[in-house]
């Protein structure tokens, strides 16, 4: 008899068929208490859980006593109560490798869009303001040969450094939990403390996961240390930044501009002051959102769940210790 799983994210037919070759699949649209109650028997018997963006906490796990593995279609897992999963010996699988290049592309796009004011001037053209040869009030700033500061030199940081170094001749500073000899050898990157990076970088790119240690890591103190001409980029997790402090720094001119793909609250409220600032490029968390990469992420998550329920946690497992 096939193990039962809950699927809470719509998948392409070919991936759904692959799941159904291995499991009895119950599809739901979300993990709300109402949905769990409506499908109580399926949740009670499920050994696997696959999807993205929904909160998985102890209250849900209480309803899933047979759960052995959950697989998220994402690299981040801050919506999972990892302690609760560990306590119940439930494996957590994620997709850390397949989105690297695409997210690095998004970061580079934010760097270019903010420095060259791409969104702002495009909107001015559409509004009919381009009526003569443009003057300095339309000008942006160069990207090439400017100093890039990367906070978090993981896979995505490395991919961004590659683009910046070889494509734009940018000197690279980085701050991370440990030094990265490969980054220093390949990209001539210089490891430094966070204060030095903030003071010297023309672009500060934040690529960190959300943890207890990183929550509000960037606040008023950090923005005050940046150059007034510096541009802040965040494509990691929104709550790593104190958004009120960011808004204040932009309003006071402590920093020049910001390119943001993540926010403390998502979707970003329509009355956020960030949306009224022409020097802010705000994206709807599109870091990995291409057709190709999202398919590959879903395929990876499917493979991860199959592997986990077969006892294989050699890769992409957040908590392999619970399998021992």
From Swiss-Prot:
PROSITE patterns: D_2_HYDROXYACID_DH_2, D_2_HYDROXYACID_DH_3. Catalyzes the NADPH-dependent reduction of glyoxylate and hydroxypyruvate into glycolate and glycerate, respectively. SUPFAM superfamilies: Formate/glycerate dehydrogenase catalytic domain-like, NAD(P)-binding Rossmann-fold domains. The keyword Cytoplasm applies. This is Glyoxylate/hydroxypyruvate reductase B. Belongs to the D-isomer specific 2-hydroxyacid dehydrogenase family. GhrB subfamily. NCBIfam families: PRK15409.1. Signal peptide: none annotated. Transmembrane segments: none annotated. It comes from Escherichia fergusonii (strain ATCC 35469 / DSM 13698 / CCUG 18766 / IAM 14443 / JCM 21226 / LMG 7866 / NBRC 102419 / NCTC 12128 / CDC 0568-73). Its main location: cytoplasm. It comes from the Bacteria. The gene is ghrB. One of its GO terms (molecular function) is NAD binding. Keywords: Cytoplasm, NAD, NADP, Oxidoreductase. The active site is at 237, 266, 285 (proton donor). GO terms for cellular component: cytosol; plasma membrane. It catalyses: glycolate + NADP(+) = glyoxylate + NADPH + H(+); (R)-glycerate + NAD(+) = 3-hydroxypyruvate + NADH + H(+); (R)-glycerate + NADP(+) = 3-hydroxypyruvate + NADPH + H(+). The keyword NADP applies. HAMAP family: 2_Hacid_dh_C_GhrB (MF_01667). Its EC number is 1.1.1.79, 1.1.1.81. InterPro entries: D-isomer_2-hydroxyacid_DH, D-isomer_2_OHA_DH_cat_dom, D-isomer_DH_CS, D-isomer_DH_NAD-bd, Glyo/OHPyrv_Rdtase_B, NAD(P)-bd_dom_sf. Homodimer. Disulfide bonds: none annotated. Coiled coil: none annotated.
């Amino acid at each position: 008899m096939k193990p039962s799983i809950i699927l809470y994210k719509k998948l392409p037919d070919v991936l759904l068929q692959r799941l159904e070759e291995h499991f009895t699949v119950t599809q739901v649209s979300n993990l709300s208490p109402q949905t769990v109650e409506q499908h109580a028997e399926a949740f009670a018997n499920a050994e696997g859980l696959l999807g993205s963006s929904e909160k998985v906490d102890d209250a849900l796990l209480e309803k899933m006593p047979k759960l052995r593995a959950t697989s998220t279609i994402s690299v981040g897992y801050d919506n999972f109560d990892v302690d609760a999963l560990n306590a119940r010996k439930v494996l957590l699988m994620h997709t850390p490798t397949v989105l690297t290049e695409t997210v690095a592309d998004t970061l580079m796009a934010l760097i270019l869009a903010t420095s060259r004011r791409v969104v702002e001037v495009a909107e001015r053209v559409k509004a009919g303001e381009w009526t003569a040869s443009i003057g300095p009030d339309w000008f942006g700033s160069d990207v090439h040969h400017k100093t890039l500061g990367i906070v978090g030199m993981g896979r995505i940081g490395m991919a961004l450094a590659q683009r910046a170094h070889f494509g734009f001749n940018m000197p690279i500073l980085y701050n991370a939990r440990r030094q990265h000899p490969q980054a220093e050898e390949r990209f001539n990157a210089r490891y430094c403390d966070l204060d030095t990076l903030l003071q010297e970088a023309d672009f500060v790119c934040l690529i960190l996961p959300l943890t207890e240690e990183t929550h509000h890591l960037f606040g008023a103190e950090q923005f005050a240390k940046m150059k007034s001409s510096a541009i802040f980029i965040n494509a990691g997790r929104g709550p790593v930044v104190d958004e009120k402090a960011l808004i204040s720094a932009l309003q006071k001119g402590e920093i020049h501009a910001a390119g943001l793909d993540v926010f403390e609250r998502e979707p970003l409220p329509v009355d956020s002051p960030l949306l009224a600032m022409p020097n802010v490029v705000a994206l709807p968390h599109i870091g990995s959102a291409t057709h190709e990469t999202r398919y590959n992420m879903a395929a990876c998550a499917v493979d991860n769940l199959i592997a986990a329920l077969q006892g294989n946690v050699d890769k992409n497992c957040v908590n392999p210790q619970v399998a021992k």
